[in-house]
């Protein structure tokens, strides 16, 4: 199984926007560009990384691919 991360933040209009993080540390909705992890633990570790810190005001959720 593979895992990926969903990020959510409140946009300037006050509404939540949800997106996935790409390998380039960009927001994406393109499945082919999702940053995948081999284990849930690796994905959880990413949420505490310097890359994740660049996404200020975001909350992260680890998703199992195929759910």
Q: Can you name each region flagged by the protein language model?
A:
Residues 32-67:
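Short, mixed-charge low-complexity intrinsically disordered segments
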Residues 2-31, 50, 60-62:
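Short aromatic-glycine-(Arg/Gly/Cys) micro-motifs in beta-strand/loop hairpins
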């Amino acid at each position: 199984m593979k895992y990926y991360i969903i990020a959510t933040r409140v946009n300037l209009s006050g509404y939540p926007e949800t997106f996935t993080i790409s390998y380039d540390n960009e927001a994406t909705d393109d499945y082919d560009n999702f940053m995948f992890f081999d284990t849930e633990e690796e994905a959880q570790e990413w949420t505490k990384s310097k890359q994740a810190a660049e996404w200020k005001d975001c909350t992260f959720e680890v998703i199992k691919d195929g759910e």
